[in-house]
């Protein structure tokens, strides 16, 4: 692994990111059961209550939690700054976000104004707290590298989509604003996918591929310009979508081209890595590159089909790209955190990162997840595959939870033993 340029001494307590990581698959399981017991006709449109609830069980409960956990871990290490009160802030934010997400799902599915109101407050405070402490840390950064710049940009988009999301939730409480729901929801989803998640993934990739896979570093043009180019495209799309909708496809093409270029670059970097050993995480990177390419261009051409295939676009980009790459990152980040923190405490005779998760179970989880994604795509045309696809998804999420709990249990077990080396002599007095 390449630790060049990292401030490992600034890493937060292991509990800060782990609490988000360990709960994420549970929301995936919940989303799977919601799909299993939903009416397939209700899932064929993005604006049905079932689709909205399931989408947010995944986007907030799984993707949001993984991204927030990663920000609390990676920002201090990459930028050399301390997130203020990170453990306390993450605990409070975590509790509010879990409670807020669950009450939102209940409120949407039961059309209960009380649950929706409670979730509006919980999610609003939870996101504001977490984003706020991260922004405070970013303001102290002196050396803005490419990854930190991408994180900062993604947080701007995150702030906007959180405000939009809270407004959209408010429209389920007060009907007077429901007429604005579809316009805001469209911007909310596009900026959430490409602006927050997409740009954050690009920034993290600049660091993760060279670090974990000993792949060639990205060129300076890519690291310095691509995030701004995509951001410009997203702002251009917003303006065109609102005022000149007939020309919004031009901005879509702009955005899709640069994400396709990113996907192609990732594929080539993986081909050129100095240790070409394939594991399930490499599979996830490659599959996500394919789904990103397909989804981006599906998104462009969906306009010519009166947006009939928007759900498929969401499956390709939200599922095949963002969801898949997050799972792949969990398989690297969780064992790394366990290994790093045990090492820092003086435990030297511990399993390596690659030994902490059962490789066969990880491969089985990958296969089940891919079957479920492909099954959901087929279900769009042939509804009889819904139940089987949902069951595959549930099983894959259960396996993912088991796989990432295994290193954590190992951490707890080893911590109860005596360290191989006494690190107290190096502690700051």
Where are these regions (language model features)?
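Hydrophobic alpha-helical transmembrane segments of multi-pass integral membrane proteins
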Residues: 1-429
């Amino acid at each position: 692994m390449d630790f060049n340029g990292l401030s490992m001494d600034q890493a937060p307590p292991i509990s800060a990111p782990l609490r988000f990581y360990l709960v994420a698959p549970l929301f995936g399981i919940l989303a799977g059961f919601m799909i299993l017991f939903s009416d397939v006709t209700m899932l064929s449109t993005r604006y049905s209550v079932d689709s909205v609830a399931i989408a947010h069980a995944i986007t907030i409960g799984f993707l949001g939690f993984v991204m927030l956990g990663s920000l609390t871990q990676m920002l201090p290490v990459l930028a050399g700054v301390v997130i203020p009160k990170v453990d306390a802030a993450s605990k409070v934010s975590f509790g509010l976000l879990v409670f807020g997400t669950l009450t939102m799902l209940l409120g949407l599915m039961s059309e209960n104004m009380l649950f929706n109101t409670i979730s509006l407050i919980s999610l609003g405070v939870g996101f504001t707290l977490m984003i706020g402490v991260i922004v405070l840390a970013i303001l102290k950064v002196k050396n803005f590298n490419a990854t930190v710049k991408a994180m900062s940009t993604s947080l701007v988009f995150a702030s906007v989509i959180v405000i939009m999301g809270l407004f959209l939730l408010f429209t389920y409480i007060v009907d007077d604003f429901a007429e604005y729901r579809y316009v805001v929801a469209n911007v909310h989803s596009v900026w959430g996918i490409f602006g927050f998640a997409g740009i954050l993934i690009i920034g993290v990739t600049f660091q993760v591929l060279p670090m974990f896979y000993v792949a060639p570093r990205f060129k300076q043009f890519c690291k310095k310009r691509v995030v701004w180019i995509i951001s410009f495209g997203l702002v251009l799309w917003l303006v065109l979508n609102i005022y000149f909708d007939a020309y919004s496809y031009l901005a879509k093409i702009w955005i899709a081209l640069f994400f396709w270029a990113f996907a192609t670059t990732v594929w080539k970097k993986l081909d050129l890595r100095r240790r070409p050993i394939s594991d399930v995480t490499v599979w996830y990177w490659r599959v996500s590159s394919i789904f990103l390419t397909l989804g981006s261009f599906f998104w462009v051409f969906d306009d010519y089909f009166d947006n009939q295939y928007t759900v498929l676009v969401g499956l390709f980009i939200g599922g095949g790209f963002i969801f898949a790459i997050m799972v792949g990152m969990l398989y690297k980040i969780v064992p790394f955190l366990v290994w790093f923190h045990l090492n820092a405490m003086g435990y030297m005779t511990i399993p390596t990162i690659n030994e902490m998760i059962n490789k066969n179970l990880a491969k089985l989880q990958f296969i089940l997840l891919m079957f479920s994604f492909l099954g959901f795509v087929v279900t769009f045309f042939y509804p009889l595959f819904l139940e089987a696809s949902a069951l595959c998804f549930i099983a894959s999420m259960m396996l993912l939870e088991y796989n990432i709990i295994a290193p954590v249990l190992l951490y707890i077990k080893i911590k109860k033993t005596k360290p191989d080396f006494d690190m107290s002599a190096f502690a700051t007095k």
